[in-house]
């Protein structure tokens, strides 16, 4: 059966922090790279002192590289905006960084964190990415999806803030194990169940999203825009 994934040649996944890309898109990344597609990941922030231990920031980046290697990511692009403090960064600076990475990679498909996530970094990254992806530029992604991030998307306020209502589902039945292995690389981030950042919670969400469309496991997205 044909899939919309067949139309993707080069994808860019924007992650506010290391591991967001695996939580939201790990199975889809693995499926795309198995098809021979080119997938890039841009991580927009870095933990800085005094809020974060610099050694911990280095460790989580090393974990991310290990996870990305497992998933077949073509290249990881690091930015050093302060984690949990993006609201202190000039919006124009974040816009410029996003425009630069989108222009340099020239993806046909963009995966973004959801604007309704409770973490302000996610909201700001979403907004800047949408600025960078405007179709008035010479190079722009023709399709944009928002992904869900356990521990962020699920803490919105329904009816008050934007609610994640997926309309695209990617069958990751054959890639759920790869996603779990990639998440397992983040030893500094994985927590025990019933935390949302546990292997059990991640698997439960994949099974629920899969059952929604009669699949064993799936990742859910919102299609934000497609230009044909």
Predicted features along the sequence, with ranges:
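Metal-dependent de-N-acetylase/amidase catalytic core
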Residues: 1-14, 35, 55-58, 69, ...
């Amino acid at each position: 059966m044909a899939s919309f994934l067949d139309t993707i040649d080069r994808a860019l996944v924007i992650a506010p922090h290391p591991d967001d890309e695996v939580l939201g898109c790990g199975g889809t990344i693995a499926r795309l790279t198995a098809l021979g597609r080119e997938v890039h990941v841009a991580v927009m922030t870095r933990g800085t002192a005094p809020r974060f231990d610099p050694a911990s920031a280095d460790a989580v980046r090393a974990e991310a590289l290990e996870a990305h290697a497992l998933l077949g990511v073509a290249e990881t692009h690091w930015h050093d905006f302060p984690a949990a403090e993006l609201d202190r960064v000039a919006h124009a600076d974040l816009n410029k960084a996003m425009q630069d990475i989108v222009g340099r990679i020239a993806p046909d498909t963009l995966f973004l964190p959801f604007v309704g996530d409770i973490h302000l970094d996610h909201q700001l990254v979403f907004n800047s990415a949408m600025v960078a992806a405007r179709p008035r530029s010479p190079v722009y992604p023709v399709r944009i999806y928002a992904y869900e991030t356990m521990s962020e998307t699920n803490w919105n306020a329904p009816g008050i803030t934007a609610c994640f209502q997926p309309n695209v589902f990617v069958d990751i039945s054959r890639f759920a194990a790869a996603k779990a292995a990639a998440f397992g690389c983040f030893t500094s981030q994985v927590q025990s169940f019933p935390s949302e950042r546990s292997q059990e919670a991640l698997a439960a969400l994949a099974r629920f999203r899969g059952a929604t469309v009669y699949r064993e496991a799936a990742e859910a997205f919102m299609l934000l825009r497609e230009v044909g």
